[in-house]
Amino acid sequence: GRKKEKKQGAVSVEFCHTGFTYPGSEKPTLQNLNFTIRAGEKIAMVGLNGAGKTTLVKLLCGLYKPTEGEIRIDGKAIGDYEKESYYGLISSVFQNVQLLPLTIAENVSSGTKENMDREKVINCLKLAGLWEKIEDFPDKENTSLGKGIQKNAVGLSGGEQQKLWMARAFYKEAPLLILDEPTAALDPLAEQEVYEKYVRMSEGRTSLFI
């Protein structure tokens, strides 16, 4: 489904005769893809398991390179961007979230204590619906993650980890938002919460929801 919402800061995405074949495989996973997501649009993509949806996401994130054709962001081929500059355009939320054994605040800001905006971190945790739990921790947002790895560290449930990753996406404010089956392992209540957060998170951005 499509919802058009052209806003400043959003980017356009074009798949131009794009294909991808995994090394050692004779059969392409994706072949001759041609479609455009206009700046500010919100696209939902559905398909059977094994149809290549996650491969498409990895291509768009720059983790894989197309074996044919190209992908353009705002008319510019992904390969023509500096890596750091390109990664700055994307916020992503995946099904299997890997949190770092750092503090909650550092996970949200993707940075060190010296360059983070602590007020923004807390606001993003509130938007993601996680602050109420974190506020009960003695060290609040300074609590370390990685229970069993660090002293006084805590563990988060699958749903809570998804919320933390969403807070990270809120914090980054990248113009392109990608969610790859973020609700696949969640119960119906947590799934509904993710959809509600997605609406907030995708405001003013181009977004792709798998």
Give the residues covered by each predicted segment.
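Transmembrane helical bundles of ABC transporter permease domains
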Residues: 1-4
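ABC-type nucleotide-binding domain
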Residues: 6-210
